[in-house]
Amino acid sequence: MSEGPLIRVEKLTKYYPVRRRLRQLFDREQHYVRAVDDISLEVERGEILGLAGESGSGKTTTGEIIVRLQEATSGVIVLDGHPLEADSRADRKRFRREVQMIFQDPYETLNPRFNVFETIAEPLRIHGVRDRSEIARRVTDCLEIAELKPASNYLHRFPHELSGGQRQRVAIARGIVLEPKVLIADEPVSMLDVSIRADILNLLKRLRRRMGLTMIYVSHDLATIKYLCDRIAVMYLGKIVEIGPADEVIAHPQHPYTRVLVSSVPVADPDYVREQVSVDDAPPDQINLPEGCRFTPRCPFAQSDCAGCDHRLLERRPKQFSACIYTEAELKPRSIP
């Protein structure tokens, strides 16, 4: 084990080439969708980092690159001090044992022909566990940890025989059966009933304490991120625009985009007076992105010099960084057409 952050991402990019249409055949320039564009972040051991943003922000793509479901266009990922540049089969197998992912829709990610036992046992067999009693013990233990008790009631069921919450618990059990260091959860509660969501979030919290897991929690829902995560990284059109402690980012958002997201979170208090921050325009074309700050065309506080600024993260409060060139106190209503 090395010292320092468990995960370090440096200058990560993911560009998708755009297929040319007939009128573009004579255009020699290749265009790209810059889904993830030069982001860097660190995740400490035992930390839960939330990746927040609306659809198209690049948060899910970032998670999939870290777990190596997609290959980055460029950049470096370092896990426990080891850069993931080597492409040997042994390195990939070791990495997949240490980093696991939970997906948004458990029904689509569970093989309908596998019962619960086979679903959870498969990763063990792939990684060389052959002893049947050992496999049975670990499968049962993981079901119990995922709070499907008694495990014997679920071992021989198929996905269609389970509720949505039970399927997600099976997916979690499969994710922890190899005892990974890192768990990446991509919108794990967005398709569940509200009554079940808190149970799954509390389960993730207990897994962190019990197994010492480090997690990256991907979601558009700031309320669940605030409840679960230690820090939040807010993404917009492939860039991290703000990162900091979860409570501070929610209470004192420094970037206008974060302020828009926070203002949209429902609060169960009829007397609570929230800041009203809204945007009217749709996100810009991801192929032809605006110069400077990418939020400028939609930003209610945009000024004339925003179009020429860079995307550097500046520390605005202790351990809270924003890519906006203005401080919270300096933000004023838009003065450009």
Regions inferred by a protein language model and the residue ranges of each:
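Short catalytic/signature loops enriched in Gly
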Residues: E3-P5, V18-D27, Y32, S152, ...
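The feature captures the beta-strand-to-loop junction immediately N-terminal to the Walker
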Residues: A52-G53
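Conserved ABC transporter NBD signature motif
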Residues: G75-L84, F95
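Conserved ABC ATPase "signature" region
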Residues: P83, E134-N153, V262-S263
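Conserved ABC ATPase signature
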Residues: R157-L162, Q166
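A short, proline-enriched helix->beta-strand linker immediately N-terminal to the Walker B motif
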Residues: V177-K181
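P-loop NTP-binding/switch modules centered on Walker-like glycine-rich loops
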Residues: P188, L192, I196-R274
